[in-house]
Amino acid sequence: MNDAATVLGTADLQEILRLLPHRYPFLLVDRIIEIDDDNSAIGIKNVTANEPHFTGHFPEKPIMPGVLLIEGMAQTAGAICARKTGIGSNLVYFMTIDNARFRKPVVPGDRVEFHVTKQKQRGNIWKFHCDAKVDGQLVAEADIGAMIVSKEDA
């Protein structure tokens, strides 16, 4: 008998650092609280006031840039790809973005959840639908594409 805890995986910061090449200040996923094989994942970003982009976006009313929400989605998707295709031997390139929508601002103190679901995979091309949520409310969404390449071919 399997319950959700045994079927779904997670990734703490150390595992994310093994899966992704990103490092501070561009690592935008603090933890992955749920990974369902190569089908879906939920990544977490705890937004803090001392992140470098807030010094200029905007000093009097800091708002997380939308492009960084998209990057957090892409990094969560990249973790799915890296786990499935082999850590260390491949690179995951963010390829496409479609249907991006920004619904509400994300500010310091928010906890963003990146909900990423694989829509299709053909060869080394993966497509995902992504939602970013704060307190259960949709703040951004996009469809993104990724390409898996061997480090030898990169």
UniProtKB/Swiss-Prot annotation:
InterPro entries: FabA_FabZ, FabZ, HotDog_dom_sf. It is found in: Cytoplasm. Its EC number is 4.2.1.59. It catalyses: a (3R)-hydroxyacyl-[ACP] = a (2E)-enoyl-[ACP] + H2O. Keywords: Cytoplasm, Lipid A biosynthesis, Lipid biosynthesis, Lipid metabolism, Lyase. GO terms for cellular component: cytoplasm; membrane. One of its GO terms (molecular function) is (3R)-hydroxyacyl-[acyl-carrier-protein] dehydratase activity. Coiled coil: none annotated. It comes from the Bacteria. Its main location: cytoplasm. One of its GO terms (biological process) is lipid A biosynthetic process. The active site is at residue 57. The keyword Nucleotide-binding does not apply. SUPFAM superfamilies: Thioesterase/thiol ester dehydrase-isomerase. Belongs to the thioester dehydratase family. FabZ subfamily. Involved in unsaturated fatty acids biosynthesis. Catalyzes the dehydration of short chain beta-hydroxyacyl-ACPs and long chain saturated and unsaturated beta-hydroxyacyl-ACPs. NCBIfam families: fabZ, PRK00006.1. This is 3-hydroxyacyl-[acyl-carrier-protein] dehydratase FabZ. It comes from Sinorhizobium fredii (strain NBRC 101917 / NGR234). The lineage of its organism: Bacteria, Pseudomonadati, Pseudomonadota, Alphaproteobacteria, Hyphomicrobiales.
